[in-house]
Amino acid sequence: HAFCTGKYLREVILPRLNKGLENSGRRREDFEISGGGFVVTGADDEAVSKMFEWVRMRVGFYGSTPSYWPVFEQHGWEDLGFKLNDLSKKGQWEQMTNEVSDDIVNEFCAVGRFDQITDKIRRRFAGSVDVIAMPENTPSDLLEEIRQIGRSL
């Protein structure tokens, strides 16, 4: 799921996954991990900024749901989940988005223009996931470049 930070992935999900694989006698190579956050990218800074704001809204929306609060808890953001949940019950959707800081949004995504995103993806996802979802407007040559690094993620 995209509602996942690098810290939550490394400190909670991967250890649990590795224990499950060990208990079942399966190898990590036989299992594919998809996701682990959002990829925020575009041709220029304006496009990146627009997508960043969309992710802010998604984090506010998902974060209002108690099922997703363990991610917040891993960062010490428990109060944010309660606040977002309260705002959702009041139908204050815009205020929910406003409660999510830039720093929090950045924990959930790799951010950069098309000419920067490969490095950002490598830093964010290396050693953690096998497959990531890219925005639909990503140029095909960039997708191929990311596919190549994906083999070494």
Predicted feature residues:
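Active-site-adjacent structural elements that line small-molecule/cofactor binding pockets in enzymes
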Residues: 1-153
